[in-house]
Amino acid sequence: MSERLLVLVRHGQSEWNLKNLFTGWKDPDLTEQGVAEAREAGRKLKAQGLVFDVAYTSVLTRAQHTLDLILGELGQKGLPTEKNLALNERDYGDLSGLNKDDARKKWGEDQVLIWRRSYDVPPPGGESLKDTLARALPYYVQEILPSVLNGKRTLVAAHGNSLRALIMVLEKLSPEGILKRELATGVPIIYRLNADSTVASKLDLAG
């Protein structure tokens, strides 16, 4: 029986995470801490005895750099990798590049909270979580999931909100449930799937 392995990891801390800025499709790189988080993710996966056949990531530097560092720790630098904007972070539109405290001053605490935490209300010029799922989910179903079900050990390095789309399907969460799910930077989540694509086991490598 082939192993149906899927590992998800959010990119390590970025320069804009550190500065408390809305990032979205803007393209800052990792901080020193983010680099360390990505390397630690690779070491944790190696300690689990994992190797991969294929990887998927976004077109944004912070996710690609995270993937590269993980693969370096695994000794798998040449791993076939698909890069697709379907896995990009949620586009925060007019909020992109703004300090979160400054955004609260401009639009008010309640409005910014609605944009950040509601399922289907987008910020001006940007995407809601529902919009993000609408592009990430088809990519998962059409590209990533068939790879896993065909026995390819699959690693996905992406972003908090695009990974929420995958987790929503994997764990059968409601919109309310996925909104409450926080994903730490640089922490791998290991799923093993049944033949019908349901989750057989899950291991979160936090800590």
UniProtKB/Swiss-Prot annotation:
Gene Ontology biological process terms, A to Z: gluconeogenesis; glycolytic process
Bilayer-crossing regions: none
Pathway: Carbohydrate degradation; glycolysis; pyruvate from D-glyceraldehyde 3-phosphate: step 3/5
Record-annotated active site: H11 (tele-phosphohistidine intermediate), E89 (proton donor/acceptor)
Keyword Phosphoprotein in annotation: no
Keyword line: Gluconeogenesis, Glycolysis, Isomerase
Gene Ontology terms, MF aspect: phosphoglycerate mutase activity
Annotated catalysed reactions: (2R)-2-phosphoglycerate = (2R)-3-phosphoglycerate
Pfam entry (one): His_Phos_1
InterPro entries tied to this protein: His_Pase_superF_clade-1 (IPR013078), His_PPase_superfam (IPR029033), PG/BPGM_mutase_AS (IPR001345), Phosphogly_mut1 (IPR005952)
Site-annotated residues for Transition state stabilizer: H159
Binding site for substrate: 10-17, 23-24, 62, 89-92, 100, 116-117, 160-161
EC numbers on record: 5.4.2.11
Family: Belongs to the phosphoglycerate mutase family. BPG-dependent PGAM subfamily.
Function, as annotated: Catalyzes the interconversion of 2-phosphoglycerate and 3-phosphoglycerate.
Subunit structure of this chain's protein: Homodimer.
Protein name: 2,3-bisphosphoglycerate-dependent phosphoglycerate mutase
